[in-house]
């Protein structure tokens, strides 16, 4: 069952779901709560790497990832990050989210941004039960013009579903949780897959 706005407010009031900083009740409507863009970004560098072998030896994948991903880029409040057509970038939500082990979250981009060509999450929009941390966004500009993205702008909406029971392996309890407690735009850790 997906939570409605009054249930989202109640879950926040009771501390069942945590969103820090807490959004105002005006940002909780229908079945979603708005989230804003943080100030941590990562991009792909100009590079000569012909490809990344996603199933290659762990050491080679790690070396390839280090060659192509930038260090963390911090954008000051009021400044803009420009995402050019055909570019992919990583960023975070301003808010940090904590879910219990019986709630799954879903991130959706804003329709107004999609109509300009901005994909907020390329494919990974599930927030696992037991999640704690900021949500990394996988931005892609499918439009024709560069887009100026500024910290604190409304970037997406979260919705929440109650599971049929409590997850036996919630994200925060898993030893293989690669992005546990993330607070910045962490690049891919596919090299840590088994």
Curated annotation (Swiss-Prot):
Residues 175-194 are annotated as: Disordered. It catalyses: dCTP + H2O + H(+) = dUTP + NH4(+). GO terms for molecular function: dCTP deaminase activity; nucleotide binding. DCTP binds at residues 110-115, 128, 136-138, 171, 178, 182. One of its GO terms (biological process) is dUMP biosynthetic process. Pathway: Pyrimidine metabolism; dUMP biosynthesis; dUMP from dCTP (dUTP route): step 1/2. The active site is at residue 138. Belongs to the dCTP deaminase family. Homotrimer. This is dCTP deaminase. It comes from Actinobacillus pleuropneumoniae serotype 5b (strain L20). The lineage of its organism: Bacteria, Pseudomonadati, Pseudomonadota, Gammaproteobacteria, Pasteurellales.
